[in-house]
UniProtKB/Swiss-Prot annotation:
Residues 14-276 form the Protein kinase domain. Changing H78A: Lack of phosphorylation. InterPro entries: Kinase-like_dom_sf, PknH-like_Extracell, PknH-like_Extracell_sf, Prot_kinase_dom, Ser/Thr_kinase_AS. GO terms for biological process: regulation of glycolytic process. It comes from Mycobacterium tuberculosis (strain ATCC 25618 / H37Rv). It is a single-pass membrane protein. It catalyses: L-seryl-[protein] + ATP = O-phospho-L-seryl-[protein] + ADP + H(+); L-threonyl-[protein] + ATP = O-phospho-L-threonyl-[protein] + ADP + H(+). Belongs to the protein kinase superfamily. Ser/Thr protein kinase family. Residues 365-387 have a biased composition (Low complexity). ATP binds at L20, G21, A22, G23, G24, M25, G26, T27, V28, K43. This is Serine/threonine-protein kinase PknJ. The gene is pknJ.
Length: 589
């Protein structure tokens, strides 16, 4: 295809209506779906990209991942393919412009900017919870609908293509410079990264929407200047650029753009809430930059009603969540596995220039600057010089970040086709019955009777398993419960350990209505090693044949409960201890 498509021409069955835009990655057209009565956004990728065999393979895989994302703030992917040697992808058509267009048209007010970031944050929290990193967060990818009434709709676009580009290092000079303006330091430095890189980029995007400038402006030697800014300069302030914005907004952006990913917000939603509070003067009592957290997947709810009435992240309802622990029930259809890709994303073909910039900046910086912005430092907690500081209480919003990423769980258990289900956000009454009745907590966590709910301030459970095969699946259950203080967590651990001792070294009987007969479970005598209590449960009957390794521990105000079902006995024992220790290591204290 030597020239761009004209109106009325047909490409891969799609009838072209008009061009919507063009860039280094390709051209986007409004095109009529060949089978359905609707128009879609058809992106035809540049010939340079389409010719690259590695990119083609990655494009197909990442487009499939993007097609599995289903969220009102994410542009839906309908189809992808190749035609006449060109790769293409058909997406939901959003009738409107994007946030970059609105900024240039001088219609991006401060209130609108904070609203747009809040809507994008919903999309990011959902994607991160599925194990998907966007990698190219910038205002041009924030599509704005022309709503007839009510709130403006915001959709995040270009998931799959950005990921595929990042893995191959193919793009154009213009695309590279646009991406550099929002790139996280760990990405530019060639380090491993996760969803928190998206949060840094979202902080850069908010700065741009509020001020009309990129955080680190490019002049002569554009790539060098921008990379140097991201790596070594403190986050810029908005209060001295935009009348009416306070130091509180400076602190919010400073946290989002922290050089150390562990000092950023624990979720995009937490960032958006803090930005709205800074703009409107909402309640921010007690808010400080977040403690280190290894993995960003979700957000906490605004305080108000009881914690169990507030879902975490983008989840709004969990009528029948998959239960944490043994025995496995009939889980909903699993999602496709999402993978955090931890390899270095080469920023582009001209990243040779950017790499040189990193080298030049590093070599000329005899002492890297680590100054903390005054506004952020003012919000940091202080401690007495004579009294050792107490570890901070772990709050509800930080619980998801304590769990290992999906890829790490796969490595722990040695199984790669695991998928994560929707999280469990409150204790769940088990399906079925057990004899003796008090032994439910030994079989699996999350049973309401195991906790004094009046002392619980946060609850987060995640079940990860294989797609259904008709046999007992390999399954990992992770549950973390935050209590009002450390003493309460230790009391709950002691109570659970007592139940385990009473239920260990015997046979307990499970029954569920869908089973033909009860299941006999043999339980081992609990063992305690390095503060972790473990128990093994096995079923060898005709209804179910499975082994479960179960572990509980507590640190600070958090109770940790992990169980693993796998036929590989040695792997299960190692994995349940490994995952428990991983979580404990991330809890302050």
């Amino acid at each position: 295809m030597a020239h761009e498509l004209s109106a009325g021409s047909v490409f891969a069955g799609y009838r072209i209506e008009r061009m919507l835009g063009a860039g280094g990655m390709g051209t986007v057209y409004l095109a009529r779906n060949p089978d359905l009565p609707r128009s879609e956004a058809l992106k035809v990728l540049a010939a340079e990209l389409s010719r690259d065999l590695d990119f083609r393979a990655r494009f197909v895989r990442e487009a499939d991942v993007a097609a599995g994302l289903d969220h009102p703030n994410i542009v839906a992917v309908h189809q992808r393919g190749q035609f006449e040697g060109r790769l293409w992808i058909a997406m939901q058509f959003v009738d409107g412009g994007n946030a970059e267009d609105a900024l240039r048209a001088a219609t991006m007010t401060t209130a609108r900017a904070v609203y747009v970031i809040g809507e994008v944050a919903k999309a990011l929290d959902y994607a991160h919870q599925q194990g998907v990193i966007h990698r190219d967060i910038k205002p041009a990818n924030f599509l704005l609908s022309r709503a007839a009434g009510g709130d403006e709709r915001v959709l995040l676009s270009d998931f799959g293509i950005a990921r595929a580009l990042g893995d191959t290092g193919l793009t154009s000079t213009g695309s590279v410079l646009a991406t550099l303006a929002y790139a996280a330091p760990e990405v530019l430095a060639g380090q491993g990264f996760d969803g928190r890189a998206d949060l840094y980029s979202l902080g850069c995007a908010l700065f741009r929407l509020l001020t009309g400038e990129a955080p680190f402006a490019a002049g002569a030697g554009a790539a060098v200047a921008v990379v140097a800014g991201h790596l070594h300069q403190p986050p810029p302030t908005v209060s001295d650029r935009v009348p009416g914005l306070s130091a509180a907004m400076d602190a919010v952006i400073a946290t989002a753009m922290a050089k150390d990913p562990m000092r950023r917000f624990t979720s995009a939603g937490e960032f958006a809430h803090a930005a709205a509070a800074a703009l409107y003067g909402g309640a921010t009592d007690g808010w400080v930059p977040p403690s280190p957290a290894p993995h960003v997947i979700s957000q906490g709810a605004v305080p108000g009603s009881p914690w169990w009435q507030h879902p975490v992240g983008s989840v709004t309802a969990l009528a029948t969540p998959p239960g944490h622990g043994w025995p496995p029930g009939l889980p909903p259809l699993p999602r496709r596995p999402r993978r955090y890709r931890r390899g270095v994303a080469a920023v582009a073909a001209v990243m040779v220039v950017a790499a040189a910039a990193v080298t030049a900046v590093t070599m000329t910086s005899h002492q890297p600057r680590t100054a903390t912005p005054p506004s952020a430092a003012a919000l940091s907690p202080t401690s007495s010089s004579t009294t050792p500081p107490q570890p901070p209480i772990v709050t509800r919003s930080r619980l998801p970040g304590l769990l290992p990423p999906l890829d790490d769980v796969k490595n722990f258990v040695g199984i790669q086709n695991l998928v994560a289900h929707e999280p469990m956000l409150q204790p769940q009454t088990p399906n079925g019955s057990i004899n003796p009745a008090e032994c439910w907590p030994a079989v699996g966590g999350g049973v309401p009777s195991a906790y004094d709910l009046g002392t619980v301030i946060g609850f987060y459970g995640l079940t990860i398993d294989e797609p259904p095969t008709g046999t007992a699946p390999n399954q990992v259950g992770q549950l973390i419960v935050a209590f009002r203080d450390a003493a309460t967590a230790q009391r709950h651990l002691a109570d659970l350990a007592s139940i385990w001792r009473r239920c260990g070294g015997r046979t307990v009987t499970l029954f569920r209505s869908e089973w033909r007969r009860p299941v006999e479970l043999s339980t081992s005598v609990p063992e305690v090693v390095d503060g972790i209590t473990t128990m093994v449960l096995t079923a060898q009957g005709p209804v179910l044949r499975v082994r479960e390794d179960h572990a509980i521990a507590a640190k600070n105000n958090v109770l940790v409960d992990v169980d693993i079902m796998t036929p590989d006995t040695s792997r299960g024992q190692q994995a349940v201890i490994g995952i428990t220790n991983y979580i404990l290591a991330k809890i302050p204290g």
